[in-house]
Amino acid sequence: MVQQIINTAKEKMDKAVQAFTRELATIRAGRANPSLLEKVTVDYYGMPTPIIQLASISVPEARLLVIQPYDKSVIKDIEKAILSSDLGLTPSNDGSVIRITIPPLTEERRRELVKLVKKYSEDAKVAVRNIRRDANDELKKLEKNGEITEDELRGYTDDVQKLTDDHIAKIDAITKEKEKEVMEV
């Protein structure tokens, strides 16, 4: 029972770190990356559909994204969706593919992105701490019901704290790496 609580907490913390990493992938760092367009949806036959389901996205050069729609009739809709997104990207359409040149980031924009990275980082840490709290609450219930002793409770909560510290250290390392990537000119 106790090991199950700790394992569940570890799995949830791992998922929180993975979600944080996916969130960071959507922040552009001056380089072209297909994940930039992950959250952009196109109105396709009345349904909001992610671009990645409507087209293949390739990166032929460091600052160029090429979007090749499977259905040429949606090219205008894809272009409109990219323009109306808050990514600040300008697509150019030649009738069969859309090219997006990724402009170099300004110093001001880099600082804004670093703030965003820090916000995502803090959100991920809060998620990990909430998971710790839930696990500790479950352990305290076991102690209250007499299933484990007070000393065992202390040992198990220390294990949960170590898990928390490890995951927060991972988040900090990922944050530092992304900040460096964003500030790189």
From Swiss-Prot:
State the source organism's domain of life.
Bacteria
Q: Which Pfam families match?
A: RRF (PF01765)
Q: Does the keyword Cytoplasm apply?
A: yes
Q: Which InterPro entries match?
A: Ribosome_recyc_fac, Ribosome_recyc_fac_dom, RRF_sf
Q: Which GO terms describe its cellular component?
A: cytoplasm
Whether Cytoplasm counts among this entry's keywords is yes
Q: Give the record's keywords alphabetically.
A: Cytoplasm, Protein biosynthesis
Which family does the UniProt entry place this protein in? Belongs to the RRF family.
Q: Where mainly located?
A: cytoplasm
Name the CDD domains on file. RRF (cd00520)
Q: Where in the cell is it found?
A: Cytoplasm
GO terms for biological process, alphabetical: translational termination
Q: Which PANTHER family match?
A: MITOCHONDRIAL RIBOSOME RECYCLING FACTOR PSEUDO 1 (PTHR20982:SF3), RIBOSOME RECYCLING FACTOR (PTHR20982)
Molecular function GO labels: ribosomal large subunit binding
State what this protein does. Answer: Responsible for the release of ribosomes from messenger RNA at the termination of protein biosynthesis. May increase the efficiency of translation by recycling ribosomes from one round of translation to another.
Q: What is this protein called?
A: Ribosome-recycling factor
